[in-house]
Amino acid sequence: MNVSRLAQHGYDIVTGLRITCRAMDGRPNDMNWANLILNTDSYKLSHFLQYPPETAAISSYIETRGGSDLIDVVFFGLQIFLKDVLSRSVTMSDVAEAEEVAQAHGLPFDRAGWTHIVNAHGGYLPLRIEALPEGILTRRGVPLVQVVNTDPACWWLTSHIETALLRAVWYPSSVASNVRKVKLALRDALERTADEPELLLPSRLLDYGARGVGAFEQAGIGGAAHLVHFTGTDTLSGVLTARRCYGAAMAGRSMPASEHSTMTAWGGDREADAYANMVSRFAPSGAFAVVSDSYDINQAVSFIWGKQLRDTVKAAGATVYIRPDSGDPIETPVQVVQQLDYRFGAAQNRKGFKVLDRCVRVIQGDGITLADMNQILNRLEAFGYSAENMTFAMGGGILQKVNRDTYAFAMKANARQDTSGRWHDVWKRPATMNVKASKAGRQAVVSGMAGLEAVRLDALAGRENLLRPVWQDGRLLKDWSFEEVRAQAR
């Protein structure tokens, strides 16, 4: 079969193996992306041959490397992995598939080990996972998760799960940590310039990131991480993830909003009609957003919104969020606020700052960063405007501009148990890069004078260990609600 025919029939043109997709007739192909055995790095398939022969268990932990007194890490997302991934059982079909892939891939395969998991454990991975409460804030260098195998025949399993487990922790935790920085900046601005900052804060940052990430699943995980701190989102998969994995009936809200295609479809000569249609269609909903720079943002705000539709907007009883989507990211939104003030008026709040008539507000979401946001907020304040006039939106800045090194996430082995039951410290300490040194010995986390602190488990001395069992041998031991996560993150 030639290369084009291989691809046409669902085969990988390099390995010749069938891949997971659906054939032209709609039937599923053979490869199973949900195969837990293959949810790892390739080289880990060889690790069952590499440990000391007397090994019975390996303990490993996840942390953000480095030391700091700054509390800047939000732990979130492990429960998504536990419910969506680790709750699946391995089958003999998975074992056969993994063996085929490993051999074709140039690696040994532990068929006996995986067959043992199927027969002795019903296919569920014999692991115990301990973790901090989800949503908790901590410093770098504090263990977030600790995992160990519960079956001495599966000493290699702790390392095998590293790829999937670390990925499941670093991404949502990094997104939640970054979004918290935005929340702190917005809170500061609102506390200075708004009368009810805590009431306003949850809706001040919208998530527009769904289209800018690599997969629907990533949008859901990152979108849920954003919702830990805010309630406004257009990443529907984030709402679904919070609903499915944390029991949140509705973790986020959206509102009707236009895009350029729905506005430019009317043509430039009917731009005012396009805006008027938005008012007539959506004013009863209470709030809606209209992108207004398809042609000329200044003309749209000053003339169409500010003159032609001014009385209609004021009489509608709703709030129109005007969204500029181009121009200088700092100057343009501030100018729009000033133009709306000139046309619709503003009142002074108790702190002495101007608040636009309730019928109009501004959304700025054109590729802004946290630094941009701070500049916009500072300029608004300098001109005497409250931060409540502006709602921000971020897309890739929330969900995509992040990687494992953003907070230096790592998972490392810290202890090995031998067949007599004795634990031995395991650690790494590279002579040329001390920052990559790992912790030795099984870990615990306690509350200290400066926040959470890592201590050895054998030095706990009666103190409460905040690393608590959340999963064991296929069973969820702690089911965090989204309300609990949000309360921790406040």
What are these regions (language model features)?
Residues 89-147:
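Glycine-rich, N-terminal phosphate-binding loop and its surrounding beta-alpha-beta segment
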